[in-house]
Amino acid sequence: PPVRVLEVGAGTGPVTRELLLRLPRGSQLVVVEPSRGFTKRLRALADTHPEIKTTVLACRLDEVEPSRHRFHHIVSSLPFAIFHPDQVRQTVEQMLNQLVDGGTLSYFAYRGAQLRIAITPRGPSRNQQEAVQTYLRQVHHQHHGTTRSAWVNLPPAVVRTIRT
């Protein structure tokens, strides 16, 4: 059956491309990407899959009007590691609030993030990175999340999925 999917931080569209190929016919895909240069490319990509109703929004997630229709799945490629902890918390909460009961939120992180934190000199930057990782671990644990590695990605990534 068709599903509603929100993709946040689509960039040049590698995840968008896979979603368009894998979503059931008649599904709805909402893509949020603040870079207008990327959104032009994303719209062209969406046009190659008319069987999926795709909306590409050139804005940040916090600028999107909350939908009265919730999503079955949300995929985020946002680089949480470089965000302020409050921004990560607000963004994750906003995404979780947009999910149907039993919906999933998947997000990416790069393998080696802990190593990067460990070699960062003590100070505000390291504290911020540690706070983000601590928060994401808490959310992951609270929602009984799963983790899998994407070794073919360069650099290798971790895909974390939580269910509401």
Question: Predicted segment positions?
Answer:
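Conserved class I S-adenosyl-L-methionine
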Residues: 2-11
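Glycine-rich SAM-binding Motif I of class I
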Residues: 13-17
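A short SAM/SAH-binding and catalytic strip from SAM-dependent methyltransferases
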Residues: 72-87
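Class I S-adenosyl-L-methionine
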Residues: 126-164
